[in-house]
Amino acid sequence: MEQNMFIRILNSEMELATGCTEPGAVALTAAEAGQALRKAGVDKAEEIAVNASINIIKNAMSAGIPGTDYEGMDYAAAIGALGGDPVYLLEVMNHVPRETVEAAAALVKAGKVKVNVAQVPQKLYIEVIAKGGGHTGRAIVRDLHTNVVLVEQDGTATLDKQDADTAASGDSDVVTPEQIASFLTVRSIWDYCTKELDPMHDPIDIIRSAVQVNSVISDEGLSKEYGLAIGRNLDLNCRKGLMTRDLTTNSMIAAAAGADARMAGAPVSVVANSGSGNQGITATMPVVAAARWLDIDEPTMLRAVTLSNLIAIRIKSKFGRLSNLCGATVAGTGAACGITYLLGGGYHEICCAIQNMVGNVTGMVCDGAKADCALKISTCVNAACQAAAMGTRGVRVQSTDGIVEENVERTLDNFAILSTHGTSDSVILDLMLNKDHTPDAQ
């Protein structure tokens, strides 16, 4: 039963997506509204209103739209409403014809798509209202990127799950953050990945997909100048002798290149982690690159990638789907654990790596999804490799320092508190003054 729960969590929290997941979620919501409009006999929307939470707007406003030169949630909404099929979920924009994309762009340029801040308690909230021919389609996504809770046609609900909790309103295979937080611990993840998991026979297809699919977008990011071309330039620096090509730089290159391509809107899929493609790339590609550098066998690599992604999921379950802190710090912490395992570290050593990551990169701010996400990712991967190298020697940030506690679970809880309650000095001081010095069980 427990092993099945690990698989359920992986399948619930890891999924295929194209482009940034926030514009993808906007396009999905708009596709539901547009479909409702078409069922009323209207071929296409004439005007669109998007009401979204601050976090959604922050993450969607500068992200590239896959396969186009456009960026932002207004274009995502228009594309979704005019030609999106909700069945494709976060890949909805991948299946829209070019002529429909251009019609959507014309609608945006004509000022017919409005984006407003929704005054709601949820960090992840999207409402799209599409109008045309005297009819109205309306849809709402809430809490999770694909959790459609309301669809209306001319004011009549064809789907209404607003009063249901997240688990009940979504797919039956969805595991809620609360369920994940109560089930996953660093110890249980370690024991599962190193003692129970049979990576060559257990149904971890999503992990294999993450390795394969995210490797493709990483290679794509190296093939041309996407965005700031962080991965490509790191690779060039190695070729010029300005940097040493080693495990750390290869891991940085692999992750940053994938984010370069994704943020620029390359029409290439990723396997996301906890609703974020960049987090999926960051939790997967540094570990894959390290395994290739160390010439590690496939079963061990798959264990390490699973470990990394589950650690990221565990942190994110309390961190919040969307946050004021950068998700690369979360996924980078997972990567640090995966790399520590590849370097021969045990449970104590991965705990040290986690403490080192929290002591180092905590506080990196999320200021939206955009090209320089790749720069932040490269920084977090560099920190992950350093944390792993220190951790394998048993070196860790001490519980006298900052928000790091003696117990790794409490350190991660402190990390989550900063994400959910802000990063003010008063919050930080409160965490520093109220520590539990109970050591980890060995």
Describe the function of each predicted region.
Residues 1-8, 43-56, 246-265, 297-315, ...:
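Acidic-glycine-rich active-site phosphate/pyrophosphate-binding loop
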Residues 3, 17-21, 54-56, 141-147, ...:
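A structural signal for small-residue-enriched, beta-sheet-centric alpha/beta enzyme cores
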Residues 6-15, 55-63, 261-272, 312-322, ...:
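Glycine/charged-rich beta-loop-alpha catalytic/anionic-binding loops adjacent to active sites
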